[in-house]
Each structure stands twice: as structure tokens, then as C-alpha cells.
Amino acid sequence: MTLRTSNQLFDAYFTADSMAEVFCDQGRLQGMLDFEAGLARAEARVGLIPQAAVAPIAQACLASLYDVDALGAAIATAGNSAIPLVKALGKLIASEDAGAERYVHLGATSQDVMDTGLVLQLRRALVLIETDLVRLGDVLAAQAQRYATTPMAGRTWLQHATPVTLGMKIAGWLGAVTRSRQRLTELRPRLLVLQFGGASGTLAALGEQALPVAEALAAELQLTLPEQPWHTQRDRLVEFASVLGLIAGSLGKLGRDISLLMQTEAAEVFEPSAPGKGGSSTMPHKRNPVGAAVLISAATRVPGLVSTMFSAMPQEHERSLGLWHAEWETLPEICRLVSGALQQAVQVSEGLEVDPERMKQNLDLTQGLVLAEAVSIVLAQRLGRETAHHLLEQCCKRAVAEGRHLRAVLADEPQVSAELSARELDRLLDPAHYLGQAHTWVTRAVTEHFERTA
């Protein structure tokens, strides 16, 4: 299949090939043509049209048979893609079987064709996204377990706080992925529904056969028949867009963390290296986080597109002017961006390059200050909370002012040495002994992932 796109320079970077195929022009046409073929089979099943008309119609429902450029030019006059496509479909069928042509598109309207065609595309997109989320979850689970006990500086407000583990940080990314999978599972039955209402949503053109045809069509396309047509009730699509927005944001968080850890001043975690990857056109030494950039870019762009979907919700009466049209490129673009971000997230996470020694060095950049809380907690049990906190605060200030390690300052402080032995101080100022429940959080996140996958 030849993909038609105006963004060939960027698509390989921002979009997964598999998703680009779903939403290329041929993919859109095939979704609509699948609706028309399914409609013919459904109407023949209930006896509304002759069975002999089905084969000629179905045989003409192949996207490769149509001139996309000609259809695109016609849309500017027709106002939607279904009108010129149905005309071209009828013309092609008539050239082979004039009798069958009269049964094309019977009882349907343009929006039925386009919305159901879109849902069929979204079904394919949903499978791709779910598959990538599972794969990403598997990778993150493995990495979280691998680095479950690897200490690093926790950072709050972009400053060193207390020690955490790299595994705990990765487990946080994993938890967001797991929740996104759960949301997609929950919305799937609401999203994958038939659109079939005819001109104004009543299916009046089909008379008493309307509901039997709708039921048969839903069965043909393996979609759910909703309680009624949803021409101007767009919450299903907006819900899907919203969940994709959450996925994009979660991936952006992952990308932001990795990019910050790749900074020269941190240099703790890196994207996988490859020839020509992350270089500069002028600076030979550069190793840029090009994968993380895609995640952050998607997290920046997708919310605006989701906002467009929300803005398009108050559609007029039974069929909308302009608001429906605003969805056409928006939702596919959201899918494309999320797919590209997921693809990059998997590649980056699989090949993470970690420098535990650098993490250890960075933990000691503040010369023990990141463990001040650990000492304060123990002293509070012996001196009282306020006294201990004030004492540690003064010791920390002295350590900074004098350029000394907190361990040395504390050892010189009579109130501290009276309560804590040298051995106790050494243990309290060892990051490996102040990781709290970090390992537990890793175990819980990994367990949750695999329970959702089973």
C-alpha cells in the first residue's frame, strides 16, 4: 500500500509507520468502503436488496480502485469525503453491473459512512496503541526490577532532596502506562459502535426494515449497535481523545525525566547510543536526547488537539456545521502523535544506559545534606522534633558555609555526638539505608502491570 502524506520529512520521527498506514488516505477510504460493503451484505441478509447485488458492490469496495487526487479535489465542492466516494463507487459498479448500482448506500447518509469508517480505523489504531503500551510496560517492568535497589538523588523542585532508586522512578512511569491500558480497556465498548442513522437520525428511509438492517450491519462490521445514532453526540470520540492525551502526558513525563538525567550536570541515565543518533550539525561532542524530544513534543501538541475535540462537542441539532468537520484531521493526528511517542518510548526504555557510579557521585554532591532528614528523624526521638530540626538546620548551614561534609560537622557537634555514635552516623549518612519503601513500590507496580496483562 502506498502511503499518501504531506509530511514525509517528519513522519518517520513523529509517527509510527503502522499508525501512518491506518490513517493514510487509502486507510480512510477503505474504512468508508468497508461500511458500504457491510451495508449491502446487511440489507441483503434482511431481504431489502437482492443477494445478487452484494458481490458487485463488495468487489468495488477496494480503496486501490479509486483516484485519491480526484476524490480530494471533489471534496472541496461536496463538503465531505463520502459524497464523491459514493458517486465514484456507484459509477464503478454500474460499469460492471447496472442493476446492482441502485442498491449502493441505500438508507445511509454521508456521516454514517464517515463516522463508521473512522470507528473502523480507530479499532485498528486501538490495537496498535494497546500493543505498544503492553510492550512498553514489559520493558519498564524489567528495568524497574533491574534497578530496584540502585540509589540516586531524589529531586524536588529540581533540587536534591532525599535518596530514591532508579527502579522507583521507572516504576512511576510504569504505573502511568498500566493505568492508561486500563482506561483503554474500559472505553473500548463505548468507542467501537456503529454510526447509522440516515438523513436526520431516524432511518425513516428504510421503514420497518430499519432496525433489522442496523442490527445486521453492526454484526457485519463487528461493532456494537448503540442505543441510537450519535451524529451530534461526540462524547465517545472525545473520551478516546482524552485518554490518548493522558498517554501523551505520561510519556512526556518519561521523556522529561530522561532528558534531565542526560544533562551534562547529571549524566546518570542516557538514551541508547547509535551511529548518527543525537548528534549536532556543528558540535561533535553532543549526545542529544532525540527520543525524549518526541515524547515531550507529543505531550505539548496533543493537549491542544484534545481541546479541539472538546470544543467541537456542542454540535447543532441533528447534524453539525463545521464542528464535525473540525474532528476529521484532529483525532487521526492525535493517534499519529501518540503512536510515534510510544514507539520512541519503547526504544528509549529498552536501551537505557545507566551510570550507577555517577549516581553515587551525585548523591554526595551536597556532602551528606541529602541525608539530613535521616539524622533529624532519629535525633527527634531523643531530643524532640523542634530541637532536632533546628540543630540539623544549623549543622547544614555550617557544612555549606565551611565547605565540609555534614558527617564531619555532626561529629563535631556535642549535642549530636552525645546521642549518636560514629557507627550510627555512618549508617544514617549511607544512602542505601534511607530508601524507605522504594523497593516495595517497584514490586507493587510490576505486579500490577503483569496482573493487568494476564
Residue ranges and their predicted role:
Residues 2-204, 209-214, 277-280, 290-294, ...:
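A helix-coil-helix interface module used to build multimeric assemblies
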Residues 20-24, 70-72, 277-294, 316-333, ...:
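Short beta-alpha connecting loops at secondary-structure transitions
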Residues 51-54, 266-273, 343-362, 389, ...:
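A glycine-biased, small/acidic residue-tolerant capping/turn segment at secondary-structure junctions
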Residues 145-167, 269-279, 285-286, 317-326, ...:
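Glycine-rich cofactor-pocket loops
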Residues 212-231:
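A short, charged helix-loop
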